[in-house]
């Protein structure tokens, strides 16, 4: 048992208004700490910069998803239309993004005091995740600020936020998640289905705009091969090789190492069915990334694409894809290339997290074992 899990057994933690409340279980002893105090002290006096926009992709992970493609479009516009805009990208890896982003985009380290200053003074927040972690550190939204939530999912397979029973059992998380939802001014949806999910999962989400996801614009560009060339160059893959992309999601209650697939057998099955020589790329979910997991991937017959900045480019480059419960496969569907679902823990995952619909209702061949996946590849029609 870890120290953290032991502490949870002894101490109950929740949120009450602007206070963290720690209670020793089975006693009346309570400690209340105003978690917004530091933020009030440091940033309440700061004025809003009307031309500042802060972008953040999934808690500072890479340069991708919907925030990237909004920023990309701004940078493509005539300079006279965007002159004076202060564009800020928040990231955990500034050193990786400096060669990618133009000089006019300021890069700020995620979770730093500078990042909180940027949030405090920006007119517009463009994000694709719940800011529970930042709110837990005291982040506050001022009335004159605008928060656009673009989300990172698609036609969600797994249940999210308010639709997920076990998440709602965490009272501290629930209080901050509801606060995040109340802060949000606009939600960007890709469909009626997603709109209905937003309304339920985000506690009566406010103004929902069915504009589609900006990140999927790249699938409709004329030169689709540019992304394959870019990925092949990044990983030293020969131009004639085909790319198989494995993108598993996380497990809420399992932080162990990702079970490897029979990658060599998968490559053989793909070669038998579709021809060509295949290379396997694996991308870990940000919540599964660890030093041990990265080291484990090095020992397998795969390319580790976890740190590649933009997953959409990987999707555009791939010739075939496998996931378990990541809705990214619906984005990949826009390529009209073969996609497969490998759900080895289907029943357990459904019980803990839950699905919005049976996976058999999707257009993707479903396998529950490695052997079934190999067979689904061989008979793919």
Where are these regions (language model features)?
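A short beta-strand/loop micro-motif in the catalytic core of glycosyltransferases
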Residues: 125-126, 184-191, 281, 321-322
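N-terminal pre-catalytic "stem/leader" segment of glycosyltransferase-like enzymes
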Residues: 2-116
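A nucleotide-sugar donor-handling region in carbohydrate enzymes
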Residues: 23-38, 157-166, 170-254, 286
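Extended catalytic core of nucleotide-activated donor transferases of GT-like folds
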Residues: 68-72, 77, 101-170
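Conserved catalytic-core segment of nucleotide-activated headgroup transferases in glycan assembly
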Residues: 63-76, 201, 213-295, 367-369
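Donor nucleotide-activated moiety binding/catalytic core segment of transferases
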Residues: 107-122, 286-330
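Short, conserved loop/helix-junction motifs that constitute active-site signature segments
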Residues: 138-144, 179-183, 271-275, 335, ...
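Catalytic binding pocket for nucleotide-activated donors in carbohydrate/polymer assembly enzymes
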Residues: 297, 320, 327-381
């Amino acid at each position: 048992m870890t120290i953290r899990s032991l502490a949870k057994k002894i101490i109950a933690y929740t949120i009450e208004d602007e206070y963290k409340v720690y209670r020793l279980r089975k006693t009346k002893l309570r400690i209340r700490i105003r978690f917004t105090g530091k933020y009030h002290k440091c940033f309440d006096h700061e004025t809003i910069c009307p031309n500042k926009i802060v972008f953040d992709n999934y808690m500072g992970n890479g340069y991708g998803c919907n925030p990237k493609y909004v920023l990309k479009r701004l940078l493509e516009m005539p300079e006279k239309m965007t002159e004076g805009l202060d564009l800020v990208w928040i990231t955990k890896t500034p050193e990786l993004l400096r060669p990618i982003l133009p000089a006019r985009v300021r890069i700020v380290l995620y979770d730093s005091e500078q990042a909180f200053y940027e949030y405090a003074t920006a007119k517009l927040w463009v994000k694709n995740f719940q800011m529970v972690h930042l709110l837990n550190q005291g982040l506050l939204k001022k009335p004159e600020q605008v928060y656009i939530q673009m989300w990172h999912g698609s036609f969600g397979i797994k249940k999210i936020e308010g639709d997920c029973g076990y998440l709602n059992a965490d009272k501290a998380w629930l209080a901050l998640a509801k606060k995040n939802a109340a802060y949000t001014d606009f939600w960007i949806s890709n469909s009626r289905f997603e709109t209905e999910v937003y309304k339920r999962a985000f506690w009566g989400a406010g103004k929902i705009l069915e504009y589609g996801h900006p990140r999927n614009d790249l699938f409709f560009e004329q030169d689709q091969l540019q992304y394959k060339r870019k990925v092949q160059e990044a990983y030293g893959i020969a131009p004639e090789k085909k790319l198989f992309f494995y993108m598993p999601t996380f497990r809420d209650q399992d932080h162990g190492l990702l079970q490897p697939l029979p990658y060599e057998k998968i490559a053989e099955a793909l070669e038998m069915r579709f021809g060509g020589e295949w290379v396997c790329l694996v991308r870990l979910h940000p919540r599964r990334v660890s030093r041990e997991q990265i080291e484990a991937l090095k020992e397998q017959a795969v390319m580790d694409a976890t740190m590649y900045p933009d997953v959409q480019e990987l999707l555009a480059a791939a010739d075939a894809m496998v996931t378990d419960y990541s809705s990214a496969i619906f984005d990949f569907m826009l390529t009209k290339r073969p996609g497969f679902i490998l759900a080895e823990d289907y029943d357990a995952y459904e019980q803990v997290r839950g699905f919005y619909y049976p996976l058999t209702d999707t257009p993707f061949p479903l396998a529950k074992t490695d052997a079934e996946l190999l067979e689904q590849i061989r008979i793919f029609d």
